A protein has these predicted regions:
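Cysteine endopeptidase catalytic domains of the caspase/legumain-like
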Residues: 1-208
């Protein structure tokens, strides 16, 4: 993968128009211990009036995401760990965006049981770049993965079909899914799941 750090920069650029509370780990700093600790600390600060977002770009495997120190037995951030962190977080809305191969298989770690059911406090949404058996493709020449390309474009207003300045979960899914599917010749299909309403607000893109 050539553009994972560029994916992070592109996503951060959108989010930073809304908040200064953005924490980034890339390259050798993105070890499992550092990633877990950072998520834990940030989530612990969140109040019931907040929304939290976790963005990941890199290699994935059925059941989790690969950190910098990933090996055959350790170094992966698992769905169980993410679910546990979400369960402890008081934020009203929790979202995961992942541009990673096989990321749609994340929920399979629970063998079909959706771990989001244990997260009772607030909405929880996973938006993942590909199905269980699919790789996540990058743009020829960059600068991003196809999922990040359309995710960022959608959050900047492209997904706002009714032009009310609010990007809902349904609008974002429809926009990104169509864009990625077409761009990859139907070889990649983003998936969205969790516990939330289709009308859940993901982002207000008209921030001044």
């Amino acid at each position: 993968l050539r553009f994972t750090e560029a994916d992070v920069a592109s996503f951060n650029k959108v989010v930073k128009t809304h908040t200064n509370e953005v924490y980034t780990l890339i390259g050798s700093k993105a070890t499992h211990a550092n990633v877990y600790s950072c998520i834990n600390q940030v989530f612990a600060k969140a109040t019931t009036n907040d929304a939290v977002m976790l963005f990941f770009s890199g290699h994935g495997y059925p059941g989790g995401f690969c950190c910098y120190d990933m090996n055959k037995t350790t170094g992966g951030l698992t769905y169980t760990e993410i679910s546990s962190l979400f369960k402890q977080c008081r934020a009203k809305c929790k979202m995961v965006f992942a541009d990673a191969c096989f990321s749609g298989g994340l929920r399979k770690e629970k063998q079909g049981n959706d771990a989001t059911s244990s997260v009772r406090n607030g909405d929880i949404m996973f938006f993942l770049s590909s199905r269980t058996n699919e790789t996540s493709q990058e743009m020829i020449g960059g600068p991003n993965g196809q999922f990040t390309r359309f995710l960022v474009r959608g959050l900047r207003g492209g997904a706002d079909t009714n032009r009310d300045k609010i990007i809902t979960a349904k609008e974002l899914y429809d926009f990104v899914h169509e864009g990625v599917s077409v761009a990859t010749g139907n070889k990649q299909h983003p998936v969205m799941w969790g516990r939330f309403n289709n009308s859940m607000s993901v982002l207000n893109w008209n921030v001044k």
